[in-house]
């Protein structure tokens, strides 16, 4: 996916149209939701780089992923993000992808964003309130503080789970919280080394199927104390 990086959009719509021209965005639904969710409102402090196709730091040693990676993840999960379904965004950070998922799931869906840094959970709420307040008002987004490595079983099972940081090993608690027919997207591999984006599907009879997708570079999925030290 590196060939798609570093494009500098004039605004959100210009960036999203570039991703469609580049065939990163393939479906109308992903195009429409990324047009609707303004990345600039999730990077208020860094507005000058909001529409650059590159990851950006948002504090506490974490980043908001590059737009092409958000588009790629949404395309992978698109068939699972339907009206009335449930999704979990692990390491929700700015709240951008949580909002996208919620909009794709319609008025009866639920997107749960989990982050173990309270300040990031508050940031996500502020950003979503600025951009799509109705998601909070209608209970379509729930933002919680917790260890995302353990998932959030009280709202599961989930039809779609996205992990925004690299896991060192297969995250079994998240697999356990997948609904039959559900899909998990997670980067896997050690910090500062080769990582692979993995697609993990749970069949309707509960079997697990894994698929390696592309090489990626993500910050590590780690504990709260270490993350504070990285900030």
Tell me what each language-model feature is:
Residues 1-88, 99-104, 120-130, 204, ...:
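Class I SAM-dependent transferase core
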Residues 79-205:
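Conserved nucleotide-cofactor-binding alpha/beta core module
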């Amino acid at each position: 996916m590196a060939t798609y990086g570093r494009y500098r959009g004039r605004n959100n719509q210009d960036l999203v149209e570039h991703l469609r021209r580049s065939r990163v965005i393939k479906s109308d639904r992903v195009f429409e939701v990324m047009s609707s969710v303004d990345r600039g409102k999730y990077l208020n402090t860094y507005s000058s780089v909001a529409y650059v196709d590159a990851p950006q730091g948002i504090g506490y040693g974490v980043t908001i992923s590059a737009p092409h990676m958000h588009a790629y993840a949404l395309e992978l999960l698109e068939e699972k993000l339907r009206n009335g379904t449930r999704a979990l965004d692990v390491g929700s950070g700015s709240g951008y992808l949580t909002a996208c998922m919620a909009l794709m799931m319609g008025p009866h869906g639920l997107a749960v964003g989990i982050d173990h840094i309270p300040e990031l959970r508050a940031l996500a709420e502020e950003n979503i309130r600025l951009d799509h307040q109705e998601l909070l008002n209608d209970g379509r987004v729930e933002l919680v503080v917790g260890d995302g490595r353990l998932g959030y079983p009280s709202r599961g099972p989930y039809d779609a789970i996205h992990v925004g940081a690299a896991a060192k090993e297969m995250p079994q608690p998240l697999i356990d919280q997948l609904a039959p027919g559900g899909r998990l997207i997670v980067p896997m591999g050690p910090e500062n080394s080769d990582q692979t984006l993995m697609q993990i599907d749970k069949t309707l009879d509960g079997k697990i199927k894994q698929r390696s997708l592309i090489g990626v570079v993500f910050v590590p999925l780690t504990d709260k104390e270490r993350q504070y030290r990285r900030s």
